[in-house]
Amino acid sequence: MPERHQSIDAQLRLLAPGKVSEDDKLVEYDALLVDRFLDILQDLHGPHLREFVQECYELSAEYENDRDEARLGELGSKLTSLPPGDSIVVASSFSHMLNLANLAEEVQVAQRRRIKLKRGDFADEASAPTESDIEETLKRLVSQLGKSREEVFDALKNQTVDLVFTAHPTQSVRRSLLQKHGRIRNCLRQLYAKDITADDKQELDEALQREIQAAFRTDEIRRTPPTPQDEMRAGMSYFHETIWKGVPKFLRRIDTALKNIGINERLPYNAPLIQFSSWMGGDRDGNPRVTPEVTRDVCLLARMMAANLYFSQIEDLMFELSMWRCSDELRIRADELHRSSKRAAKHYIEFWKQVPPNEPYRVILGDVRDKLYYTRERSRHLLSSGISEIPEEATFTNVEQFLEPLELCYRSLCACGDKPIADGSLLDFLRQVFNFGLALVKLDIRQESDRHTDVLDSITTHLGIGSYAEWSEEKRQDWLLSELRGKRPLFGSDLPQTEETADVLGTFHVLAELPADCFGAYIISMATAPSDVLAVELLQRECHVKQPLRVVPLFEKLADLEAAPAAVARLFSIDWYMNRINGKQEVMIGYSDSGKDAGRLSAAWQMYKAQEELIKVAKHYGVKLTMFHGRGGTVGRGGGPTHLAILSQPPDTIHGSLRVTVQGEVIEHSFGEELLCFRTLQRYTAATLEHGMHPPISPKPEWRALMDEMAVVATKEYRSIVFQEPRFVEYFRSATPETEYGRMNIGSRPSKRKPSGGIESLRAIPWIFAWTQTRFHLPVWLGFGAAIKHIMQKDIRNIHVLKEMYNEWPFFRVTLDLLEMVFAKGDPGIAAVYDKLLVAEDLQSFGEQLRKNYEETKELLLQVAGHKDVLEGDPYLKQRLRLRESYITTLNVCQAYTLKRIRDPSFQVSPQPPLSKEFTDESQPVELVQLNQQSEYAPGLEDTLILTMKGIAAGMQNTG
């Protein structure tokens, strides 16, 4: 069928007619991968199924071109007539083609980046979607912004970006698939290399087909929900694959960039430029599956992994350092070690006999290797049986012990004139030790403030001094402070404990038992008052935590954000607390709940103001404040292009120290592959440096006044629909797959805080996820149109002020650009399909009204931004979205009709005979359908639905 063949390529070329630039290979990459995939589909399932998939694709592509909704109906009736086995294969095919399109994009982006670096052409760096290159940033600071080189070097040395990995319910892709995707990317990259021979090409092509087929034949659906340990292992796999080697490579690039602006020094290995933390196994907020045992396991697991990673590199280092010249200080140490160790260690692969004394560096490193071996084994024993026969003295217990012999080698090499050798693998190794430590990542603990209140309440009740929960804030503070200043223990083993109390105290006991370098911060969610922070300080002391964790209040809801500065000021006015914190405090601000509460515009503005106020308070008390940004991956939950988001923060709020959460669903796009990892580290570093040295402007008073007014109108409009419209919840539940979302086995956390209840009790994640699935994105734009309309009706000249804000004020610019990106991905026509099929007759008009509101908001946005068309400023993104859309449309239609069949068993469909050659024997049950044993729906429906959810999530990218 050659003419069909052309058709899918031709459709791809029609969708993105002009090349965006001469190095643009995206359409080529995409067509190659899709062609390979369709050939595989035909081999496995026969020509009829392949033809069916192509027809669906064509209908979708035609709809994308002419927006004729009749085509969607035609597509729907085609899809509903499929038998269960076929419908799973078709949904899975589209989901895979989308994944392949994403891989083609990643390769194209990395490729374009390399070409730009070669040419040194950064003309479009100023536009939103491109990211800042570290060398360009350094050069710009020195040449254009008049900073001295030393200032820049100093700022870099003292800057810290702490990336906090969180497990995430919508990391929709299984690890088994992530690895296959990595290999597909590599094949694609090599296939287009300049110096490739015909044989190479043939072998790569075979490898590519093999990997695509392996991915397609893997069950994409998790059949059991992941445990927190699974989530943690998934997160840690990125360290193995890319981050471990990526960090020293990146730091080396910074050395090069510094050299190129005339600094002839390397970045010291103990400069804390990048750090990694994690919430996986530490975040208990609303997740009953994270117990004290889980936390202990996760810490030991990370320590074991770290020791193993160092261990795997130490022999290479021993090979490299074969010199015999060394300093006296090192010679003495080597002789001591040589005399004391006499046995041969046969379980090592290299250097298993005793190292001769004329290789002093190897003697020293041999001892380090022994200690690493024992460190790893001890963690392994503790993890599997809780006890270990290896004494603690034989292992590394803190990072200083580990650094000391390595620093000794470094000093000695430099003293003997071998500095170039010292700056090789040894420097990389030192940097790894400094960045990752013995624990690989620092684990944060997060718990709700009410749980601490309950524990203290049971203590005060037990002591017979009243009920802590009923006391006023003043009384709580007085009691907590008198206890903190006193010395006596609060409770003994006779304290009556409920399951909840035992869980909270158990966590503190784990903090006391494990080495202090395992942990980062103790975060209190729903924190409102100083007593919330003091309570954690007291519990840490009572449970004998030797080096108490820093306590970080988290402010999320709109009202909490408004009250945050006052609460922090009250905290700083307590002398005991000021003595405890040593001039440093961290505050976390959460994006997702504030957005669900009041809509995106008001939440973003409230965040901005809260940060400004918090910084003022901290300055007044002489405290260095670190902001911890809890951003989601989606725009509705604070996501968006990294460097832009950083540069749009208020001036003075970052000051060279930034903590940001990297959500599960974004980890893959940020660290999934070497080049991506490099780019992510570069983006965060460059943007943080630039924000500190060249802060964005403060908004003019009239801009502030306008924003305040707009936020009030936007919140009112948002709440009038989401919270006050009596039938909104009913509409939301029927127009989106929210009810079915919980079946996806995506994360270890329940999707509701409380089983019954309306929008309030829904977690922010499913709320956003559901609207992204139908491509209506309601929480992101709702309220925005009303606000702009109100401002323009009040005074027609305000449009000029808004345009000025858009052009001059990064915060406003970013807020609008993200909105524009969401409009580019949205499609009310698709949302209408869901409405027609799933929403009750008398609610249809409500949906129509919302869609009208959507179109109006979009027009107003374009007017303010001065664009004729969505995304006209970003041709690259526009092209990528066009290529993805046709796949997503088919999945949307398939999802809407599948939901209809699940919810309305009487819905009439006319079944066809099976298309796939795998399922032609009708007497046999289809194996593919039997993978799902538990489904309560008709065969095949649940899996088809889950596949469409995953596919759409992959297509929208910043979804989850």
From Swiss-Prot:
The keyword Methyltransferase does not apply. It catalyses: oxaloacetate + phosphate = phosphoenolpyruvate + hydrogencarbonate. It is found in: Cytoplasm. The modification Phosphoserine is found at S7. Keywords: Allosteric enzyme, Carbon dioxide fixation, Cytoplasm, Lyase, Magnesium, Phosphoprotein, Photosynthesis. GO terms for biological process: carbon fixation; photosynthesis; tricarboxylic acid cycle. Its cofactor is Mg(2+). SUPFAM superfamilies: Phosphoenolpyruvate/pyruvate domain. The active site is at H168, K596. PROSITE patterns: PEPCASE_1, PEPCASE_2. Its EC number is 4.1.1.31. The keyword RNA-binding does not apply. Homotetramer. Belongs to the PEPCase type 1 family. This is Phosphoenolpyruvate carboxylase 1. It comes from Sorghum bicolor.
